[in-house]
Design a protein with these regions (language model features):
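Sequence/structural signature of beta-propeller domains
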Residues: 1-335
Length: 335
């Protein structure tokens, strides 16, 4: 019942540990407790002493556990996906020999529009696949969706074969290949398969003070399919009338045609077929204050009534508050 949660504002805590207890019958949240953090952003243990790292502006947006000893975190500020060791929970814990040759994938910031790069991660532990997708359209693929242009974001869903990546890293550790960071990064494309994903168009044409339209999270299902959270956040200058519209789609990329990173989008592009599971809208009005910006998803468990319980996390665009809520889907609806 311990979950790792990243913060897009912290330059000291790598992630926070939350104890989340859910009713096994109803799926309702019963208790949420922030246990603090054990690991710093530089990968060292938090010993409780004042500390300030040399690097700042990570803007960590997503986290997945990829093994018993490591996890991967997406940094929007650094345009990277990076593996970190899972450290002991206390300074008195026995020292363990951690893997040093950890994986990292960096992208050029020029590939993305501002604040529109890596927002999501999902890990399929059964097939050892690491999934991610840019939040919005890449620069080389066109303009991001806005209320004014009415475009549908065209994204590139990426599947990294984590099993093969780690197998290759183990060979490097044994001295069979060059283990330099630069060389290893160039080889990652050998283990990556990409797919074309098209979002829905903006639902409004009104002028916004803040507007965000993109995929805010992915979630890997046990059968190899994915849940995709499309999120549209609209905030006018006067704030009244702000809304956040979310749509949950189910896709099956493993049974779909791939789309190379070198290919250009066209009328013949094999976009992934998507099935709408549910959608909801929250907002801000004179009488109602329900605005909720959903940014994280994880599978909790199968409930006693055979429903699939999914935990979701929300945060404000200004970073002033973070809460956790839950939504449920019948297992038969996501198979």
């Amino acid at each position: 019942d311990i979950y790792a949660v990243v913060s897009d504002k912290s330059d000291s805590a790598l992630y926070f540990n939350f104890r989340i207890q859910v009713n096994p019958k109803t799926g309702e949240l019963e208790q949420i407790e922030n246990l603090g953090f054990t690991e710093r952003t530089d990968g060292t243990l938090n010993d409780g002493k004042p500390w300030q790292g040399k690097e700042k502006g990570f803007d960590h947006e997503a986290i997945v556990k990829v093994s018993d000893s490591s996890l991967v975190i997406a940094s929007e500020g650094y345009c990277r996906l990076k593996e970190f060791p899972i450290l002991p929970t206390s300074a008195d814990a026995a020292k363990v020999g951690y893997q040093q040759n950890l994986w990292e994938s960096r992208w050029a910031s020029s590939d993305f529009y501002p604040n529109y790069n890596f927002e999501s991660l999902a890990f399929d532990s059964i097939r050892q696949y690491l999934w991610t997708i840019p939040e919005s359209t890449l620069r080389k693929d066109g303009q991001p969706a806005t209320p004014q242009n009415g475009l549908a974001n065209q994204l590139r869903l990426m599947r990294l074969d984590w099993g093969k990546i780690k197998e290759n890293r183990n060979k490097e550790d044994n001295g069979k290949e060059d283990s330099s960071e630069q060389v290893s990064s160039k080889k990652d494309s050998r283990y990556m398969t990409t797919y074309a994903y098209q979002m829905d168009q903006p639902s409004t044409h009104k002028k916004a003070d803040i507007y965000v339209m993109g995929v805010s999270e992915l979630c890997a299902l046990p059968d190899g399919q994915l849940l995709v959270l499309e999120r549209e956040a609209f905030i006018p200058k006067i704030k009244i009338g702000a809304f956040c519209k979310c749509k949950f789609y189910q896709i099956n990329p493993l049974n779909s045609e791939g789309f190379s990173m070198k290919e250009n989008f066209s009328s013949d592009t094999p976009f992934l077929k998507k099935r709408l599971l549910t959608e909801w809208k929250t907002g801000l009005s004179l009488s109602k204050r329900s605005f909720a910006n959903y940014e994280g998803i994880t599978i909790h468990d199968i409930l006693q009534n055979f429903w699939l319980s999914i935990l979701m996390i929300i945060s404000t665009l200004r970073g002033k508050s973070v809460t956790i809520r839950d939504r449920q889907f019948m297992q038969s609806r996501v198979q």
